[in-house]
């Protein structure tokens, strides 16, 4: 606080006048102010402090008040050091330079209610546990989100690896019938991609037997399904569909 009368610092939220006419400085303005957080001074001049505040102090009650009207009671238990406990907040709107008259009616705008310390401690512990649980859940959610992102990435990669863009000459199937090799191949016919059945006549020569399926999105052949991926038309292989095909369907020319 420094030297000189502290009264020159009035008004200041941290400066109080007590029942002994001393000035008390609070480092903190909490409901309980322990001895390590307040110091006092016997001033030589109280003229900067309005007489109404000085006259408010009752010498029979250990108390102090600041310019805001915050009233603290000085408490001393046998087993504890002295401390100040906030009692409430007085309406000081009618406090002036003169002493308060004996019949002045004091009005409290707020009375401080202290709670049980053990309950406060339990509440703090519960809040701490709650925060720890929240943090744990947040960490787990973050971890799950990372796993989810990785799974989506792997799924996308798997889908990409199972996707082949349709192009002229793409072979989807080979078979051997009566000693002759047959194949199902993609051909571009009149600007349309079609599934064409071809037979090997001699060596590298293939003869077209017929164009059967227009390869557009949704078309199916054996385990192949025509799909669109990133704006491109292609095929992916569906092993589940292939395994579910019955004999009658397989005997058909195109499935």
Swiss-Prot record:
Subcellular localization(s) per the UniProt record: Virion
Source organism (scientific name): Tobacco rattle virus (strain TCM)
Entry keyword set: Virion
Any one cellular-component term (Gene Ontology): virion component
Superkingdom, natural source: Viruses
Entry annotated with the keyword Lipid metabolism: no
Biological function: May function by interacting with a small, flexible domain located at the C-terminus of the CP, forming a bridge between the virus particle and the internal surface of the vector nematode feeding apparatus.
Name of the protein described by the UniProt record: Protein 2b
